[in-house]
């Protein structure tokens, strides 16, 4: 049975994600920008939290961990490489490790770039991937610690997941990301359609997260740095893929 997903808005533009196994009653949360909205979502559904999964150490993803742990007794799991700057971990994780939510098994994927210790969680039976600030709707995270090459390789890992995977990223950034993408390829029919869809969703107050990986592969410029059409659009026809990615990231940082 697939996990039930609840997207919980936090702060001004963050998301936490509750995942619930109806068969066992077990519930986990991925990232905790603040505890209040997560506790409210749990109470509304009568769910008990047993596990907190963390993608990376930034405060807008972990600030609510201690309050939530104190209120629920949930254990906390995060990257072993970042244990020294995450809230105290009950379980340290690395590439290929498995986490469980009830009967569902998720795999840890190391995705350095935004931070050097960033990880993602892929639950194949539910077609869910929790990517934090690595792969995002129409974008990717800024390179605060890692290199462009590292982030490009991380994005390639994520783009190799099944295309039906739902990408649960950590922020509501799609509208800005889409406007930027349109500056690179203003005449792309697929991009025009997606920009319009995102704008309509936000006008109606609907989240753009999660997004389909197939849509990201088709329209997210940060996943398409190896495509000839995008290389031509940025004037880097003969450049290496990671160099094109770095240029797109540089332009987005100034957008």
UniProtKB/Swiss-Prot annotation:
GO MF term set: hydroxyacylglutathione hydrolase activity; metal ion binding
Cofactor(s) this protein cannot do without: Zn(2+)
Keywords: Hydrolase, Metal-binding, Zinc
Residues the record lists as binding Zn(2+) 2: 60-61, 133, 171
Swiss-Prot/TrEMBL catalytic activity: an S-(2-hydroxyacyl)glutathione + H2O = a 2-hydroxy carboxylate + glutathione + H(+)
E.C. number(s) listed in UniProt: 3.1.2.6
Keyword Heme: no
Domain of life from the UniProt record: Bacteria
Keyword Hydrolase: yes
CDD domains: hydroxyacylglutathione_hydrolase_MBL-fold
Annotated Pfam families: HAGH_C, Lactamase_B
Pathway assignment: Secondary metabolite metabolism; methylglyoxal degradation; (R)-lactate from methylglyoxal: step 2/2
Binding site for Zn(2+) 1: 56, 58, 114, 133
Cofactor: how bound: Binds 2 Zn(2+) ions per subunit.
GO biological process, one term: methylglyoxal catabolic process to D-lactate via S-lactoyl-glutathione
Enzyme class, first EC level, given as a word: hydrolase
Known function: Thiolesterase that catalyzes the hydrolysis of S-D-lactoyl-glutathione to form glutathione and D-lactic acid.
Record-stated family: Belongs to the metallo-beta-lactamase superfamily. Glyoxalase II family.
Self-association state and partner proteins as the record states: Monomer.
Protein's name according to its UniProt entry: Hydroxyacylglutathione hydrolase
